[in-house]
């Protein structure tokens, strides 16, 4: 519910090449809440992407991407025991979302080569960059600290977050 509400309420920044999907800040919560978060966020992504202008590709592609990102984070957080594991795992979520979502948005939108800081950047790179920057903000700068704070509050924080 919360994931879908955030996306539906902010469609202008949730469904574009340059996007900050604020609801993706919930993805690192799978490291805290495990399988219930994986299931809830996957269902929330599916519901949210029913409103996507990119149809079934975003509906299935985005949902499967977030399923893999949250499942991977849950499993890795349980098994990685080194300092800095949680931010590393959150960064892997950023990379997964960047390359999968950025790639299919590039194909669906047909992003042309774009002038960026005096350089011509291939459309696929521009697409990845747009999704990457937004994902860093939502997942790494908002989501990871929120997950860490919740884990600390619940006293579920392992020493390697």
Enumerate the language-model features and the residues they cover.
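Hydrophobic transmembrane alpha-helices
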Residues: 1-36
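Small-polar-interrupted transmembrane alpha-helices in polytopic inner-membrane proteins
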Residues: 2-3, 41-49
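Membrane-embedded alpha-helical hairpins and interfacial helices in multi-pass inner-membrane proteins
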Residues: 7-21, 47-161
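N-terminal, well-ordered alpha-helical segments
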Residues: 24-27, 41, 45, 70
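Membrane-helix interface "capping/anchor" motifs
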Residues: 30-41, 78-86
